[in-house]
């Protein structure tokens, strides 16, 4: 049976400042930790990315032509405050006014994120969100943006608090490149959630007319053998690290007893302790019912097996299928069932996981209000042939995820939109330019855009709301 989506459903495309804009030193933009980190550790940099800084009118015209009626954009904090606080860079501010005006001119609603992995270098090098001073700096930056950009109707505070802690302090593929420090992972999650709560409370206290929420990456975790209590426990603990800890902070305003028991178990095995203060919980509690929406980024699920050894994580950054490894002391290891498909980067393709995650949020956090799927898509080594890409694999991936969103809506979940990652090809944090996600192919040499087969398909789905 052909499935459909509601008439008012947003069919969006997602971007992020650092991954799309390029122009990393242009018009007074301050440095971010990624600038040097990429130069020192990777085979690529964020120049020129998709040159969105100059070419946004082209991308927004394409969005309009292909029925993409929403776009995720992030403001580069260091374009507005080059050192993270203090003096405002008016050229940066002007750029975003122009960008938002172009969005509205093209009928593409901007959903604007304040922080998408790009803390200004001056603040990142003094501890990023492990340093509580930076909570204050973030809230001041948020306050400035809320006041400066009344044309923005949809705000999100952070993109993917979970993967920031994970990338910076567990896997170590994000600056500062620290590995296996679970206490820092949880402390980063917590301090960023306090920052989020303070910004949301401020937005509501000031009476701004728009909506505000947060974007969480929520990869669903399953036990490898559901009949084995040790595998079930491994999945629960892995879920706490990546999902439950931050969801509790968002919607309960505290960490449930079960969540904290799991956190203590993980820290007992790995060392370290957390600094959780009474005033933190006051603000989390005050903000828990103020979120207007939840953004869910979903790409994959994981299966967890009991494991009794030392921590070892190998990140597959080059698309060499089967090269990744993930096992955490006191938690478990990832072990995928043989019949589940994977991408070249070992990301497990499992649309049912998105359905299960949406329904989990609905069941466990009934104050969620509404959901947007703020990122979902397929990274591929696209082959450019005859001026296009015949990306049937991407179409199939997106189709199956849209179908389970339709199912979730039928089953009572309030899901209002979907943003494909990504609108056009962008640079990928730990994979560079080889891993492409866009509806529009970008020739990074010439910066020309070419619609892929998926763009034509997505246009039709957006036009008809029929998933065909």
From Swiss-Prot:
D-galactose 6-phosphate binds at residues 19, 116, 159-160, 297, 428-429, 435, 437. It catalyses: a 6-phospho-beta-D-galactoside + H2O = D-galactose 6-phosphate + an alcohol. The active site is at 160 (proton donor), 375 (nucleophile). Gene3D superfamilies: Glycosidases (3.20.20.80). One of its GO terms (molecular function) is beta-glucosidase activity. GO terms for biological process: lactose catabolic process via tagatose-6-phosphate. One of its GO terms (cellular component) is cytosol. Its EC number is 3.2.1.85. Belongs to the glycosyl hydrolase 1 family. NCBIfam families: lacG (TIGR01233), PRK13511.1 (NF010036). This is 6-phospho-beta-galactosidase.
């Amino acid at each position: 049976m052909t499935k459909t989506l509601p008439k008012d459903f947003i069919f969006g495309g997602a971007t992020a400042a650092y991954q799309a804009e390029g122009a990393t030193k242009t018009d007074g933009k301050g440095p971010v930790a990624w600038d040097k980190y990429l130069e020192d550790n990777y085979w690529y940099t964020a120049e020129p990315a998709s040159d969105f800084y100059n070419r946004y009118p082209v991308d927004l015209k394409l969005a309009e032509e292909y029925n993409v009626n929403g776009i995720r954009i992030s403001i580069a904090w260091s374009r507005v405050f080059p050192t993270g606080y203090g003096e405002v860079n008016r050229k940066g501010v002007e750029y975003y006014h122009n960008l938002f005006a172009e969005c509205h001119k093209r009928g593409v609603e901007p959903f604007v994120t304040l922080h998408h992995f790009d803390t200004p270098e001056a603040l990142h090098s003094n501890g990023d969100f492990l340093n509580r001073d930076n909570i204050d700096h973030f809230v001041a930056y948020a306050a400035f943006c809320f006041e400066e950009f009344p044309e923005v109707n949809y705000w999100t505070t952070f993109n993917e608090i979970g993967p920031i802690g994970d990338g910076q302090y567990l896997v170590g593929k994000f600056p500062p490149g620290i590995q296996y420090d679970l206490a820092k992972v949880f402390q980063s999650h917590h301090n960023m959630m306090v920052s989020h709560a303070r910004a949301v409370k401020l937005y509501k206290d000031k009476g701004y007319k728009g909506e505000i929420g947060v974007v969480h990456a929520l990869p669903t975790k399953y036990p490898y053998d559901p009949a084995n209590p040790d595998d079930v426990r491994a999945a629960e603990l892995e879920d706490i690290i990546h999902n439950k800890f931050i969801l509790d902070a968002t919607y309960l305003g505290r960490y449930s007893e079960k969540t904290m028991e799991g956190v203590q178990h993980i820290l007992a095995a790995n060392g370290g302790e957390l600094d959780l203060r009474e005033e933190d919980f006051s603000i989390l509690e005050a903000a828990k019912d103020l979120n207007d929406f939840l953004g869910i980024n979903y790409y994959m699920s994981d299966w967890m097996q009991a494991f009794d050894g030392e921590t070892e994580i190998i990140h597959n950054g080059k698309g060499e299928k089967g090269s990744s490894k993930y096992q955490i002391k006191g938690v478990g290891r990832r072990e995928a069932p043989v019949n589940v498909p994977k991408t070249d980067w070992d990301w497990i393709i499992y649309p049912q996981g998105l359905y299960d995650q949406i329904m989990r949020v609905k069941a466990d956090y009934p104050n969620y209000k509404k959901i947007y799927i703020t990122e979902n898509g397929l990274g591929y080594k696209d082959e450019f042939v005859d001026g296009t890409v015949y990306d049937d694999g991407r179409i199939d991936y997106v189709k199956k995820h849209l179908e389970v969103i339709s199912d979730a809506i039928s089953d009572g979940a309030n899901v209002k939109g979907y943003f494909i990652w990504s609108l056009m090809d962008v640079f990928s944090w730990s994979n560079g330019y080889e891993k492409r996600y866009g509806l529009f192919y970008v020739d990074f040499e010439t910066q020309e855009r070419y619609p892929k087969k998926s763009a034509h398909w997505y246009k039709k789905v957006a036009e008809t709301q029929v998933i065909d």
